[in-house]
Amino acid sequence: MKLLISPINKEEAIIASRGGADIVDVKNPKEGSLGANFPWVIRDVKGAVNGRQPISATIGDFNYKPGTASLAAFGAAVAGADYIKVGLYDIQTEDQALELITKITQAVKDYDSTKKVVASGYSDYKRINSISPLLLPSIAAKAGADVVMVDTGIKDGKSTFEFMDEEELKKFTGLAHECGLENAIAGSLKFEDLPVLERIGPDIIGVRGMVCGGDRTNSIRQELVEKLVAECQA
């Protein structure tokens, strides 16, 4: 499992990088689950990491606004993100999801075809009036995206495991692989979740709170990053 860690600034990015993260993910928790940070923060993080890890950037929790989303995705790509990640929040239909991801993918790939698009659904999709993550792999593959993810939409301390069980998450990762996509699991994950995550076998796990001592509003701690890296490699 690759480890994606989500700092909010250059200082945290350096800690995540030194601690051994595989992917450094720039987000802004003040603006939501996949809240977007500023272009200059992405550039600063890119410079601080200096090629040691690829950079991911979230562009927001999006409802059906393909124009706005594609422009945001283009901005993240230009700012230096290697992975551009969008959340499908309050997406009502599969057709809406397909158009949103297709337009984002076109915006990113027209600029640089080596950059990857990550489409994220939400384990608590019923709470946020969106589509099931299990529908996402086939839609994302059709749209030309590279990675599908499941996260929690509402950050109230509840974990992805409170909304999707092990079998559902295994189905999600399996569907992703059948569609030729990488997959990722995130959403208030804890150290005690690692054994079940190993059984599920996602390509990537995404964390913030776990390496902030359990509170995602605190700062990332290098010793917790190193502990997580060691446990993932054990």
From Swiss-Prot:
E.C. numbers? 4.2.3.153
User: Which chemical reaction does it catalyze?
Assistant: 2 D-glyceraldehyde 3-phosphate = 4-(hydroxymethyl)-2-furancarboxaldehyde phosphate + phosphate + 2 H2O
Instruction: Reply yes or no: does the keyword Zinc apply.
Output: no
Which EC class heads this enzyme's classification?
Answer: lyase
Disulphide bond pairs: none
Enumerate the InterPro entries for this protein.
4HFCP_synth, 4HFCP_synth_arc
Write out the GO biological process terms.
methanofuran biosynthetic process
**Which domain of life does this protein belong to?**
Archaea
What the protein does comes down to:
Catalyzes the formation of 4-(hydroxymethyl)-2-furancarboxaldehyde phosphate (4-HFC-P) from two molecules of glyceraldehyde-3-P (GA-3-P).
Q: Which HAMAP family match?
A: MfnB
What protein name applies here?
A: (5-formylfuran-3-yl)methyl phosphate synthase
The gene from which this protein is expressed is mfnB
